[in-house]
Amino acid sequence: MSVEDAKRAVEIGASAIMLSNHGGRQLDGSRSPFDQLPAIADAVGGKIEIILDGGVRRGTHVLKALSLGATACSFGKGFLFALGAGGQKGVEQILKRMKDEI
């Protein structure tokens, strides 16, 4: 997503945007959401929710994203891996780890 894309989302009345690299496998050479975030937050922060998706593996990554202007983070793959490896207990453990790190 570019700054212009984010501005357009605000113009058409979107309530949120998601910065994602689609698991880093869809577009060869795509920019990291963390790299895009500061410029996009400067351009549209406060006008639209900014959800960072991609590269979030630890609680410290959540703190970094929030400090750069995100209003939320997505952590889907982490929960799926935890569920597959450890079932409900695995998900509970990863939630505890994330909370402890934050």
Regions found by a protein language model. Give the residues of each.
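Alpha/beta enzyme core
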Residues: 1-52, 59-82, 96
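Internal helix-turn-beta structural module
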Residues: 71, 87-102
